[in-house]
Amino acid sequence: MDYESRFRQHLEALHEEGRYRVFADLKRRCGAYPTADHFAQGGVHGVTVWCSNDYLGMSQHQVVRDAMHEAIEEVGAGSGGTRNISGTTHYHVELEAELADLHGKESALLFTSAYIANDSTLSTLQRLMPGLVIFSDEKNHASMIEGIRRGGGEKHIFRHNDIEHLEELLQRAPPQTPKIIVFESVYSMDGHIAPIAAICDLAEKYGALTYLDEVHAVGLYGPRGAGIAERDGVMHRVDIINGTLAKGFGVMGGYIAASRACCDAIRSYAPGFIFTTSLAPAIAAGALASIRHLKRSEIERARLKERVRTVKGLMTEARLPVMENPSHIVPVMVGDPVHCKAVTDTLLTHYRIYVQPINYPTVKRGTERMRFTPSPVHTDSEIAYLIGALSELWAACPVGKGEYVRLAAE
């Protein structure tokens, strides 16, 4: 059997659909975010990064870098094992306590990523509670979908942010059936924000747990950066919160925050937690420093809001197809995978602007887009240059997408 031909066949299909993913080879410039060096066939060029999830630029913050350097000098590079076998350093213990405090929960549990946290927790909850029925928003992240699927239990998908549809589904479940509503606070591709209070109302009415993914909100929203639930004053009503250390906090890793019994049960039964090496101590130290800083500082959040408001306003003035939403995400609709990649390739090669095309399966076919993420450190001149470049490209739209392909190839 020709196994290689099977691989090539699938790759060719991606190329034909225009959604084969190409990674940009970047080296970020420490202390000079959002600039980076882009390594390509034509050489190395400086670019401005417009699509990073390092939303607040905390990966570059001196307090985070200092904490990581100090941890390496104190304990070395790796953790040395799983959490159960020598891999629980004091940094991990302190970080979990800080996260529990951040979200107002009894406990927190660290994972190597928020993807693993979602996957492991949601699948393990179904093992711990046989017959658990899951009610999941249709736009939930792949990690949540995978965790629900692997659990193998009964699930119902409700229309995105549709409270009436969710209640219709909840009404059909027997009162004594264990239930959990799984949703996100900020949906990263559209920028929509969930009606958390209304969902909590339904959870209380029908006796369901709530599981909230705050991955794209922690650090960015709320008086101490705990997310949308904190901002809206409903954090105490959410049973389990999932978060990341890799976006707003600028480092790496994921976690859940919940009751002591819930976290202990996941700690004791989730394979994705048990059978993997723990986060490096320096990572934990950096995340700890970032969280502590953002609990006290409003500077980064205030500046982010202003930058996002500026970018959205200028895009609207330029009549660019920016998708309206109340969050920090700035999606610009293209609607075709080939066209989308051609536009982003042209931005990179001709304008030294890096933004990644977002295609299926991340978004539905026909809704391909660019996803811009302004940060506190994007300057007025960088914003003006971006708007000018996009305006030039959109002015060329009548000549068809072939013109973008030609420009990108030059």
PLM feature spans:
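Conserved PLP-anchoring active-site segment centered on the Schiff-base-forming lysine
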Residues: 122-142
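Active-site phosphate-binding strand-loop segment of PLP-dependent enzymes
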Residues: 54, 156, 160-212
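N-terminal "arm"/small-domain region of PLP-dependent enzymes with the aminotransferase-like
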Residues: 2-6, 12-75, 208
